[in-house]
């Protein structure tokens, strides 16, 4: 029986700030991952991928995006694609920047067992605030999962990307 040791995993994550800080910044994040095996290989679920949540596709629950089984259960898949486009703008008061940023974003992603299955992206859109605290950023955002038609609150402590 083929085993999980006969696998190849590829994962890439990229985050880039595209504009200067003074007037705001445009941040782009992209994640892509693939697990290639022989078709009949037995792969432990912890080697597969799920998406959704604070550091993935906001507007969806943590690891809620996956491959839907025939009985409607979300399962991990062999391919992952996720990304985010985020605009952060400093909050100004009396002509000076404060320790706060406002943020708006669009996230997209999917998990599938074939590369072609990644085409059906799930989208999340939202807005929030980031406090640049002395110990690191604290973010609170509201995100709407477009396909799920549900609003979720997300809180991050520290850098997500």
What are these regions (language model features)?
Residues 1-2, 143-146:
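Conserved short loop/turn motifs at secondary-structure junctions
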Residues 102-105, 138-143:
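Conserved active-site loop/cleft motifs that coordinate metal ions or position small ligands
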Residues 114-116, 125-127, 140-143, 152-153:
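Short beta-alpha junctions and helix-cap segments that line functional grooves
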């Amino acid at each position: 029986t083929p085993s999980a040791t006969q696998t190849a995993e590829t994962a890439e994550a990229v985050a880039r700030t595209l504009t200067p800080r003074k007037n705001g910044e445009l941040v782009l994040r992209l994640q892509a991952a693939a697990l290639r095996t022989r078709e009949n290989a037995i792969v432990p679920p912890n080697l597969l991928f799920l998406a959704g949540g604070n550091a993935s596709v906001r507007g969806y629950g943590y690891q809620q995006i996956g491959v839907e089984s025939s009985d409607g259960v979300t399962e991990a898949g062999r391919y992952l694609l996720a990304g985010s486009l985020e605009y952060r703008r400093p909050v100004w008061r009396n002509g000076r920047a404060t320790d706060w940023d406002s943020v708006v974003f669009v996230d997209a992603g999917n998990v599938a067992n074939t590369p072609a299955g990644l085409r059906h992206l799930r989208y999340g859109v939202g807005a929030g605030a980031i406090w640049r605290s002395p110990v690191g950023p604290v973010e609170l955002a509201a995100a709407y999962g477009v396909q799920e038609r549900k609003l979720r609150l997300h809180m991050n402590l520290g850098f997500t990307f």
